[in-house]
A protein has these predicted regions:
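Conserved RecA-like P-loop NTPase helicase motor core
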Residues: 80-86, 305-363
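Short basic/glycine-enriched coil/helix segment immediately N-terminal to the Walker B
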Residues: 69-72, 86-98, 175, 284, ...
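Interdomain hinge/linker at the junction between the two RecA-like core domains of SF2 helicases
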Residues: 190-191, 196-262, 272
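Conserved interdomain hinge at the start of the Helicase C-terminal
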Residues: 6-9, 17-26, 171-173, 233-287
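SF2 helicase catalytic motif II
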Residues: 80-82, 90-157
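Conserved motor-coupling elements within RecA-like helicase/translocase cores
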Residues: 61-75
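Conserved Walker A/P-loop ATP-binding site and its immediately adjacent core
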Residues: 11, 16-53, 80-81
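Conserved RecA-like ASCE P-loop NTPase motor core of nucleic-acid helicases/translocases
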Residues: 30-38, 180-184, 286-294
């Protein structure tokens, strides 16, 4: 089994630039699959490294990905396409000896939102469960409303844990590559680390260095020069504005789920958001940004005026410089690891650094 290289370095340290340098150096002797969350980054990699991307109008992207692999092309693609790689694609990865570079953390595990009735239907009629909890679909020709679940089952990623269904990245997706690089930050607070530990992957943690030719991967953990953020960040430590978040589980997903638009605490939070933005001298729509769970945005937007709706950014946003001009930030979230997911990892005594887990989302 290959050893995974984790490039753990903060934003702006040159991780993707180092990856581009590495791929351009070895692209004639190695074959690469570079995956990233965003299509514009796929285009940038194709331009900088002369890679191909699945973009045909005449076939599915997963089919085109396998076509490029059969031809031995270097490829850039999105995370979402990577998740759809099936056994045929993995066999091509092994045959052609591909290397994988993962830009930003991949979603290695998630709890699926499903009703009890639908859960029972899948478990009792549409699929069978293996001893390890893996779900296998019974009817390969099925095209009904649970087709997405069938696709997960076909890639070996659909699991049952008690009364929950989990989508867990098939570890063969990583094991099949000759080498794997993961470009990330705060690795020890991620599901990604817990996943590697759970499935017994060996990994090395390195950083990035700069020389006369640009950025390159180092052979040791990242050691950036210290930065003094005190002149760059002003925290508005107003007891009245922040009191709604004083309790340990305040602003968590479960906290929001138990409160509707007219709840006194939600109303207080909504008014606090308004007061915060109005208190910023010279603040405008171009400088404001606020975040909460996507499912709860309507609770914090005034139903009458709709004010600040256009300043919203969901907490799952990653790897973008699109909002670098925003200077007035309200982060209305308290992140905790999903207890069902932690129960799954606990079967192998795997834990996550809770402080770094929460910090991962805000950074």
């Amino acid at each position: 089994m290959n050893t995974i290289t984790v490039v753990d370095a903060r934003m702006g340290r040159g991780k993707s630039s180092a990856a581009i340098r590495y791929m351009n150096r070895y692209k004639d002797s190695k074959r690469f699959l570079y995956i990233t969350p965003y299509l514009d980054e796929v285009g940038r990699i194709c331009e900088r490294c002369d890679f191909d991307q699945p973009d045909s109008d005449h076939m599915s992207k997963s089919t085109e990905l396998k076509l490029h692999m059969r031809l031995g092309h270097n490829i850039a693609a999105t995370h979402s396409l990577f998740y759809l790689m099936d056994t045929e694609a993995l066999e091509l990865v092994r045959q052609k000896h591909y290397s994988l570079i993962v830009d930003e953390s991949i979603q290695v595990i998630e709890r699926l939102n499903i009703t009890n009735k639908d859960f029972d239907l899948i478990i009792n009629q549409l699929a069978t469960e293996h001893d390890d909890g893996r779900i296998e679909w019974l009817d390969d020709s099925y095209t009904g409303r649970f087709y997405d679940y069938k696709e997960m089952a076909n890639t070996g990623s659909l699991f049952r844990l008690d009364s929950a269904l989990l989508n867990i990245l098939n570890p063969e997706l990583l094991r099949s590559f000759d080498e794997v690089f993961m470009l990330t930050y705060l690795f020890d607070g991620q599901y990604q680390k817990a996943y590697l530990d759970f499935f017994g992957f060996d990994y090395n943690i390195i950083g990035v260095e700069q020389d006369e030719s640009g950025y390159r991967f180092s052979d040791r953990p990242d050691a950036p020069p210290p930065l003094d953020y005190r002149e760059l960040i002003r925290i508005v430590d107003d007891p009245k504005l922040n009191a709604v978040g004083d309790k340990h589980y305040a602003l968590s997903k479960a906290w929001y789920d138990r409160r509707g638009y007219d709840n006194p605490e939600i109303r207080k939070l909504r008014n606090g958001l308004k007061k915060f933005f109005q208190s910023i001298p010279d603040g405008s729509s171009e400088t404001r940004l606020w975040s909460c769970f996507k499912s709860d945005v309507n609770k914090l937007v005034d139903s009458r005026t709709g004010r600040f709706r256009n300043n919203f950014l969901q907490t799952s946003a990653r790897a973008t410089n699109q909002y670098k001009s925003r200077t007035d930030i309200a982060y209305m979230v308290n992140r905790f690891a999903d207890p069902n997911i932690m129960k799954f990892f606990a079967k192998q005594n795997v834990t996550i650094d809770s402080e770094h887990f929460a910090k991962n989302f805000i950074i």
